[in-house]
């Protein structure tokens, strides 16, 4: 008794809010469990929430790392139960697992009519699925009609709101019901384990039962707001729910990392970073006429006798994790302690930042730590770098990425070392955010778990958050923001080779497995064309810009535009080359024959991307590096050429001003709260969003719908052990596929992504196309189009030549034998239809059997030469597989 008295004294004092006296918050027991389940089943919808030992819902060996402690149910907005299941304190109150399985099996049965409503089901459902709650399987969570989520509704109502989406904030804001915080119950920051609480302690029940009750009340309010707002559509809510299931599958699939390759990439990256850092210091010191190297860098260089923190690029990934960041920190501490920098300053008059005229006197340090943004800004001022921008809050020079890139681009001619500053920052980011975490954070199974958030961006696009939370970093949690990994495309000379190092670290996980990356080819320009109906661009998408051949604009039986061939009869792959169309509009048809045509086409490409989504002459100036006058001239020429596109911009602006929002092709609302603002900057930003938002948002809707369809198809075909969806980055979805099914799977996936009626039947004139790449790593893919053409080589970075220019080498890319069968294997009739060959004497027929890659190449060339010919296999027309 006395021990109980002392235990009560140690418990914190918790305030019971007034609203809690007006509802029933009940401790669940063996005696009332059946009654509570019956009440939930009898209701149309009930609140549901779980308490856990922690937040780690990663799955190993069929179980989550943390586990369920208890579950809360609210059959009505005025009544809720909390059923303890895994409490260590007060364990005598736990419901026996035999009863849990039986009763919750009834509640979560797929045939149960009543639906649970969660707040963030993405978290709860994984715990429920992998902690023994579903003896009948998990079909309930796969069916988006069987559950609701207040977090999704709140996001869709106001996607631009970045905070205030938590249950406690919503309960207070919408219901006037303040909730108890977990740190009130468990003040110790190191212990956030609900199992340490005794469920017989009333505040434990108040907290846990309030969650489902408040969730149900918030749902009733948010659902009403969503239904009553005519601009919102249930189709988008259902799309987000369907996508959530596929994202959960993707999270469970995880990403395999070749740690040895990552380690070597880290060493090479650190070597490049070290060289770049020294080059920046040498360049700035030469301009200023004094050595600005701080002592911590001298320590790292080994120039200070007796100092211990000497930098070695190979020093990464060992037990001490002495990566460059840690070595910099240690060297700074050593320098501060034993070798402090000189405190003298140099006073100079320099131009005011961001002002047209005027100077001010600044005390500059003798040496600089350019790894510090503040000191880097000071260095720029002493160097008299032009076009610097000052922060409105601090007055210091802004050195953020985009701003700095603009400054560098304008100043690089007079200050060549500025390009080295940009390269140094890129290398620092690549190492710190990607390569080093690839080495240090990989889990015991060799994988990382990216954290994809489908409810972060107002456009609907995914974001991938980095984290430093211990429960997310340890054993495979992910610090890597995958969305930030740049594409390694055709503009290789403009991108540091380290990009390929990042992608090379993502690998297939063993023999027989291949990475397959499928991305929507030029999707945003295709969407701009479809949304604006610009006739010149519609025409261009069916025309070869090299020979001028025009392909027919036809619809299939599902009212989906038929795809154009990848290669023209002339051998060119430039069908739908809008950049050539724009360049010809600027410079004339004869410009194609000029020596600088490549640069002129590049300007056309830059203008397309700068202006298509609502940009101005300033955007042209930034993109192609021209004068302000030329930027405005090109803007006027662009709008004068593409009049329908310009009218669409105006329509979007007018609609946005009238309604305060615009929509994607699928009905997603893009709020524009500032489009009628007096503030020119805010107004201009929302005017750009009125054009750009529907384009990016429609692209996001397409990707999310494709992911949902892919999950269902993989489940239907029983491919979960042969096909994994591991990443979605920009307009690309990355899979890991076993070669046993790869030949069959690729046509299924590409048809789902580009030809499915739900995606492509939007009344569009221009088809969606996808590109397929395959490889053992994400960085060395084999383009499927090239495979069909018989190509075997790929260019990859191979250091630099004597002039410092990047070199490339051809490598042989291995291809699975089963990939050759893609040319003749049949997919399902539903996903990859192939029509019976009909007798058409005017069309030559090429009958094939099983093909080698060289034979497949010859068939493809025959089909190009005999336009309209038929390739026949097993009495089926398989011509489409060679186009």
What are these regions (language model features)?
Residues 559-573:
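Cysteine-rich micro-motifs
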Residues 550-555, 572-575:
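Cys/His-rich microdomains that often coordinate metals
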Residues 119-120, 207-223, 230-257, 272, ...:
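Core structural elements
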Residues 2-28, 56, 66-228, 239-240, ...:
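Active-site-proximal helix-loop-helix substrate-binding element of RNase H-like nuclease domains
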């Amino acid at each position: 008794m006395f021990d109980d008295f002392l235990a009560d004294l140690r418990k914190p004092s918790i305030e019971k809010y007034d609203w809690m006296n007006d509802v029933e918050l009940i401790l669940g027991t063996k005696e009332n469990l059946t009654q509570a389940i019956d009440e939930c089943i009898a209701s149309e919808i009930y609140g549901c929430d779980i308490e856990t030992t922690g937040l780690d819902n990663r799955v190993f060996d069929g179980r989550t790392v943390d586990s369920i402690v208890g579950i809360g149910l609210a059959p009505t907005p005025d009544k809720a139960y909390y059923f303890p299941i895994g409490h260590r304190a007060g364990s005598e109150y736990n419901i026996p697992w035999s009863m849990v399985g039986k009763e919750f099996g009834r509640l979560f049965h797929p045939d149960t009519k009543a639906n649970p409503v969660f707040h963030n089901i993405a978290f709860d459902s994984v715990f429920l699925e992998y902690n023994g709650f579903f003896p009948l399987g998990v079909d309930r969570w796969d069916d988006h009609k069987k559950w609701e989520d207040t977090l999704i509704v709140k996001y869709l109502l106001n996607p631009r709101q970045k905070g205030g989406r938590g249950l406690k904030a919503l309960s207070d804001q919408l219901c006037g019901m303040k909730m108890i915080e977990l740190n009130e119950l468990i003040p110790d920051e190191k212990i956030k384990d609900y199992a340490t609480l005794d469920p017989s302690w009333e505040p434990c029940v108040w907290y846990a039962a309030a969650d489902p009750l408040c969730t149900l009340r918030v749902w009733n309010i948010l659902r009403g707001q969503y239904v009553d707002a005519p601009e919102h559509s249930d189709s988008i809510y259902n799309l987000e729910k369907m996508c959530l299931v596929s994202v959960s599958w993707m999270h469970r699939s995880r990403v395999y990392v070749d740690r040895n390759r990552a380690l070597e990439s880290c060493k090479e990256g650190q070597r490049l970073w070290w060289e770049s850092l020294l080059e920046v210091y040498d360049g700035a010191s030469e301009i200023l006429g004094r050595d600005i190297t701080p002592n911590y860098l001298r320590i790292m260089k080994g120039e200070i006798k007796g100092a211990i923190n000497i930098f070695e690029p190979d020093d990464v990934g060992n037990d001490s994790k002495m990566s460059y960041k840690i070595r910099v920190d240690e060297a700074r501490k050593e320098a501060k302690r034993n070798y402090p920098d000189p405190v003298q300053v140099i006073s100079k008059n320099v131009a005011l930042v961001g002002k047209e005229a005027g100077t001010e006197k600044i005390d500059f340090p003798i040496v600089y730590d350019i790894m510090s943004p503040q000191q880097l800004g000071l260095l720029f001022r002493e160097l008299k770098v032009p076009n610097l921008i000052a922060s409105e809050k601090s007055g210091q020079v802004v050195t953020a990425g985009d701003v700095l890139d603009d400054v560098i681009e304008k100043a690089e001619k007079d200050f060549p070392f500025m390009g080295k500053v940009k390269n140094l920052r890129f290398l620092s980011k690549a190492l710190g955010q990607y390569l080093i975490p690839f080495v240090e954070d990989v889990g015991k199974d060799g994988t990382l778990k990216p954290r994809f958030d489908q409810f972060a961006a107002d456009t609907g696009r995914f974001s991938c958050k980095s984290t430093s939370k211990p429960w997310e970093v340890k054993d495979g949690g992910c610090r890597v923001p995958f969305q930030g990994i740049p594409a390694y495309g055709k503009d290789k000379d403009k991108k540091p080779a380290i990009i390929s190092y990042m992608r090379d670290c993502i690998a297939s996980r063993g023999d027989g497995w291949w990475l397959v990356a499928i991305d929507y080819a030029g999707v945003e320009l295709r969407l701009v064309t479809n949304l604006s109906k610009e006739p010149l661009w519609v025409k261009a998408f069916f025309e070869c810009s090299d020979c001028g051949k025009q392909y027919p604009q036809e619809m299939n039986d599902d009212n989906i535009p038929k795809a154009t061939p990848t290669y023209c009869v002339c051998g060119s792959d430039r069908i739908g080359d809008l950049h050539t169309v724009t360049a010809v509009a600027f410079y004339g048809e004869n410009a194609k024959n000029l020596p600088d045509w490549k640069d002129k086409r590049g300007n056309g490409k830059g203008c397309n991307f700068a202006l298509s989504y609502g940009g101005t002459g300033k955007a042209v100036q930034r993109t192609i590096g021209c004068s302000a006058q030329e930027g405005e001239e090109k803007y006027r020429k662009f709008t004068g050429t593409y009049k329908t596109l310009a009218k669409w911009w105006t329509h979007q602006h007018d609609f946005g001003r009238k309604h305060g929002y615009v929509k994607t092709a699928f009905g997603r609302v893009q709020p524009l709260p500032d489009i009628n603002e007096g503030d020119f900057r805010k107004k201009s930003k929302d005017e750009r969003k009125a054009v750009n938002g529907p384009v990016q948002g429609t692209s996001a809707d397409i990707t999310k719908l494709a992911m949902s369809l892919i999950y269902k198809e993989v489940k239907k075909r029983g491919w979960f052990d042969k096909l994994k969806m591991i990443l979605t980055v920009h307009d690309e979805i990355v899979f890991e596929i076993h070669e046993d099914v790869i030949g069959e799977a690729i046509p299924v996936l590409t048809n789902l992504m580009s030809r499915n009626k739900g995606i492509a039947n939007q009344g569009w004139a221009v088809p969606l196309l996808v590109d397929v790449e395959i490889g053992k790593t994400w960085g060395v893919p084999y383009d499927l189009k090239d495979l069909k053409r018989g190509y075997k080589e790929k260019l990859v970075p191979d250091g630099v030549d004597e002039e410092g220019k990047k070199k490339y080498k051809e490598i042989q890319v291995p291809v699975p034998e089963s990939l050759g069968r893609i040319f003749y294997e049949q997919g399902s009739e539903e996903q990859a239809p192939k029509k019976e060959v009909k007798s058409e004497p005017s069309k030559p027929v090429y009958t094939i059997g099983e093909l080698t890659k060289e034979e497949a190449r010859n068939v493809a060339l025959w089909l190009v030469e005999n336009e309209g010919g038929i390739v026949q296999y097993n009495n089926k027309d398989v011509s489409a597989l060679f186009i």
